Amino acid sequence: MEILASRTLFRPVDYQRSLSFYRDQIGLAIFRDYGAGTVFYAGQSLIELAGHGAPEHPAGPFPGALWLQVRDVRATQAELESRGVSIAREARREPWGLHEMHVTDPDGVTLIFVQIPDDHPLRRDTRGERRNPEGEPEANI
């Protein structure tokens, strides 16, 4: 199997309210508006708000979160606050080393804005690195 592309798909309770939130408050650029829904650019991914159909599962909070990497989480927080976005959890450094700030969309979906510090392991290039059976890098001999 070859995955060619992916996107996160939401079926909001109130399409117009969610459209305004993602477009006007969060500031995502529109990739495509197809009448019954809108697709936004989100870095190298896409987020789609479907204004049609109904989910096959009971209504309830989305069990996950939308993880959005930004260059500067504090500047992002200030920008969102200036647009009237309520910050659910202020920017801070997490025990795992990432800088995170949380916002909640109109349907209760958590958006986690993440800044990866320059010295964080996520920035290390591990291509070609040999690993032992436990998944840890092998020492160079």
Language-model region placement:
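N-terminal beta-strand motif that seeds the catalytic metal site of vicinal oxygen chelate
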Residues: 1-16, 46, 64-66, 117-141
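Vicinal oxygen chelate
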Residues: 5-13, 38-41, 56-83, 99-109
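Amphipathic alpha-helical segments
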Residues: 16-29
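A common structural junction motif
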Residues: 26, 83-88
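Conserved short beta-strand elements that form part of the metal-binding/catalytic scaffold
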Residues: 29-61, 110-115
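Short acidic/glycine-enriched loop/turn segments that link adjacent beta-strands
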Residues: 34-36, 94-99
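Short beta->alpha transition motifs characteristic of CBS
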Residues: 50-51, 95, 102, 113-120
